[in-house]
Structure formats: C-alpha cells, structure tokens
C-alpha cells in the first residue's frame, strides 16, 4: 500500500510522539528517550517514503531505501537524505538495547542524559525535515 494518507498519518503521529519523548526526558528516563526517539524517526521516515509513493520495507531502519530512492523524495528533503539516513541507522542500533538491555546491562544504568539528548535531537530534526511533506505538504 502506497497511500499518501497513511504516510501523512505516520508523520502526524511522529510529531505527536515528540511530546512523549520530551516527557520521558523530563522524567530522566534516558533509555526510554532513546527508544521512543527511534520509533519517532522510524514513523517519520516511513511516512515520508509513503507520501513519495515508495513502499517502506518492514524493517526498523529505512536508511538504505532513503539513499536509494533519494531522487523520488521531495526536492527539499533530498539535501538532508544522508543525515536522515545516519540518524535512522544510529538509533536503530540502540532499539532493543534501550528497551530490553542485556544480561550484564540494564538500560537505565547504561544510557546517559547526553545519549538521550542526542537521540531526542535526531528525532526532532527528522520530524522537522519530513513534516512539511506530510498532511499539507508536497
């Protein structure tokens, strides 16, 4: 399904989830900020792909598709594709670790304020780049 309406919904929901990221940041729940930021980025980028008529893969990191389909994306986004792809890859690496941890690592003890701030900034930047191409964009 390549529905622009579905893509616009993803982008709208990504914007709404930024409030959750901010609430988690205020609660100093650093691991949850990282995890939720990854989900924001995933939704926003998959929304962008759908709006552009590109079926997103059912994986968490769509960076390779963004780069491969750069020419099909809105002109204003094309200049940001590399940084958007880097943000997607970066947060994807932390997706499970931030949520589940590992035998020798608890997420709350591993992630720091700086990690959370960086993840939140990636999420904000991604939504800001993608949002103009959502519900009322091109």
Predicted regions span which residues?
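Terminal alpha-helical segments
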Residues: 1-138
């Amino acid at each position: 399904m390549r529905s622009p309406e579905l893509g616009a919904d993803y982008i709208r929901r990504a914007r709404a989830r930024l409030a959750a990221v901010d609430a988690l940041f205020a609660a100093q729940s650093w691991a949850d900020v990282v995890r939720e930021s990854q989900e924001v980025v995933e939704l926003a980028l998959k929304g962008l792909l759908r709006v552009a008529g590109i079926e997103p893969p059912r994986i968490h990191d769509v960076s390779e598709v963004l780069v491969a389909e750069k020419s099909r994306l809105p002109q204003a986004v094309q200049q940001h594709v590399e940084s958007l792809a880097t943000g997607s890859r970066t947060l994807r690496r932390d997706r499970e670790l931030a949520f589940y941890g590992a035998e020798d690592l608890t997420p709350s003890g591993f992630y720091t304020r700086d990690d959370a701030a960086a993840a939140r900034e990636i999420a904000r930047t991604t939504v800001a780049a993608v949002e103009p191409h959502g519900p009322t964009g091109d």
